[in-house]
């Protein structure tokens, strides 16, 4: 045991490892000695800009020299889908379109940035915008120039699947970017996101919290089941899911009804996992056929389906999902919410930091921001949601269904999700070449004769 000595004016010393160590005076609030914390230290201030010895983490990769924390907070409205039958061919089938109350919230930095995009009359209010917004400042007419945006073109049948949760979200980001609206009046692309955080090389997910509440009754029994999964529990087809960076792409295949077990254009997956992009009106099937049965659908004799996959209410319940009952079926309290918490990257290899902008990138383009060079759209966790009912179609496995309708001035949400998320950016590649070269080339501006 170390020898201790007391000197005048309350100084304490302890002898260990061959020398006397000066100890600070005991604080009277505590029984045992505690180290006095210094809130503002010079070294901590310097390390916020550059840490010469950042150390490593479990897989023996270097930590970034400097970091910045980003926080998101907002609300997600899980609404019923909309249909926009613009042309005459599709208009007659609008009454035969059905959808299911399912949703999928992916925890990745890309979609959180999309959720915090600008609020305009065509981007967020009242539900999702069905098509990509186009902003152009080179037109002769004032109404066609920024910040005005064009609406989706006619003679198209745009739609959005429930995986595009950011279209129904209002998210705040801290720290704020005061120039975001002026730089990106439309939805941000991967290139825009890379340039927005061009000074950072790495990023990591710290924590995300969800609080889900069912808001709409669907019969006498209609709880909303929610299940948080590590990564993407079901297969995600990134290679064909997005066109123009964020717009979903469809495929044509057989109807998901018992009887048509073969395929016409492409094999379909399990019935409960497929969300109809353009749901068919299937006829009664009496025999098993070797080809997909013709169904009435928009501009096609087959059904159009999305690559996205979802879980039914029964599947989520069988996997142990939480239930949230809507008001009227249970009194509203804290236990009325489904609480989910996701921490870290969910990576068993211990890969804490992920690539935001690849090293050595001086001109950020879409090609640099796509996988595998950038991991901006990497899914760390996925929250699957579905509402059950006592009256449902057999192949929907207890999931509530509804008829798709044209847009109205109000949206119909069946669940609300409160979200809080914390991310962190880091870099190991500053100073950039332009940090020095820009100053050298502009330092004499205005002073030369």
UniProtKB/Swiss-Prot annotation:
InterPro entries: Capsid_protein
Induction field: VP1 and VP2 are detected 12 hours post infection, while VP3 only after 24 hours.
GO MF entries: DNA binding
Annotated GO biological process: endocytosis involved in viral entry into host cell; viral penetration into host nucleus; virion attachment to host cell
Subunit architecture: Homomultimer (Potential). Interacts with Rep; this interaction relocates Rep into the nucleus.
Membership in a protein family: Belongs to the gyrovirus capsid protein family.
Protein's UniProt name: Capsid protein
Record organism: Chicken anemia virus (isolate Australia/CAU269-7/2000)
Name of the encoding gene: VP1
């Amino acid at each position: 045991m170390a020898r201790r000595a007391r000197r005048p004016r309350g100084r304490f010393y302890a002898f260990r490892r061959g020398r006397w160590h000066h100890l600070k005076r005991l604080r009277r609030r505590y029984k045992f000695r505690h180290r006095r914390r210094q809130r503002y230290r010079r070294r901590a201030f310097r390390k916020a800009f550059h840490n010469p010895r950042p150390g490593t983490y479990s897989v023996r990769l270097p930590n970034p020299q400097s970091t910045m924390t980003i926080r998101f907070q907002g609300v997600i409205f899980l609404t019923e889908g909309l249909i926009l039958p613009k042309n005459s061919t599709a208009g007659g089938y609008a009454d035969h379109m059905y959808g299911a109350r399912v949703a999928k919230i992916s925890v990745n930095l890309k979609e959180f940035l999309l959720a915090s995009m600008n609020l305009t009359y065509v981007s967020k209010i009242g539900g999702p915008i069905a098509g990509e917004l186009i902003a152009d400042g080179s037109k002769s007419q004032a109404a066609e120039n920024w910040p005005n945006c064009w609406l989706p073109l006619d003679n198209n049948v745009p739609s959005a699947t429930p995986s595009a949760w950011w279209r129904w979200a209002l998210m705040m980001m801290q720290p704020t970017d005061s120039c975001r609206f002026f730089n990106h009046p439309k939805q941000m692309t991967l290139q825009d996101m890379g340039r927005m955080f061009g000074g950072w090389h790495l990023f990591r997910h710290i924590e995300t919290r969800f609080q889900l509440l069912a808001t709409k009754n669907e019969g006498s029994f209609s709880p909303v089941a929610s299940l948080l999964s590590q990564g993407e529990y079901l297969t995600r087809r990134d290679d064909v899911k997005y066109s123009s960076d964020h717009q979903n792409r469809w495929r044509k295949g057989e109807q998901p009804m018992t009887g048509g077990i073969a395929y016409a254009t492409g094999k379909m997956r399990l019935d409960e996992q497929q969300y109809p992009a353009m749901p068919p009106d299937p006829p009664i099937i009496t025999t098993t056929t070797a080809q997909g049965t013709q169904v009435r659908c928009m501009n096609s004799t087959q059904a159009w389906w999305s690559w996205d996959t979802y879980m039914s209410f029964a599947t989520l319940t069988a996997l142990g999902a939480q239930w949230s009952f809507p008001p009227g079926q249970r009194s509203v309290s804290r236990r009325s919410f489904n609480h989910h918490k996701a921490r870290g990257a969910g990576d068993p290899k211990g890969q804490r930091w992920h690539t935001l902008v690849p090293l050595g990138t001086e001109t950020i383009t879409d090609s640099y921001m796509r996988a595998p060079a950038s991991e901006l759209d990497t899914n760390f966790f996925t929250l699957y949601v579905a509402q059950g009912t006592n009256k449902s179609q057999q192949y929907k496995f207890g999931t509530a269904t509804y008829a798709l309708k044209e847009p109205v001035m109000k949206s119909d949400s069946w669940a609300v999700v409160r979200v809080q998320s914390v991310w962190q950016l880091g870099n190991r590649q500053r100073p950039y070449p332009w940090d020095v070269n820009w100053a050298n080339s502009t330092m004499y501006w205005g002073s030369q004769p």
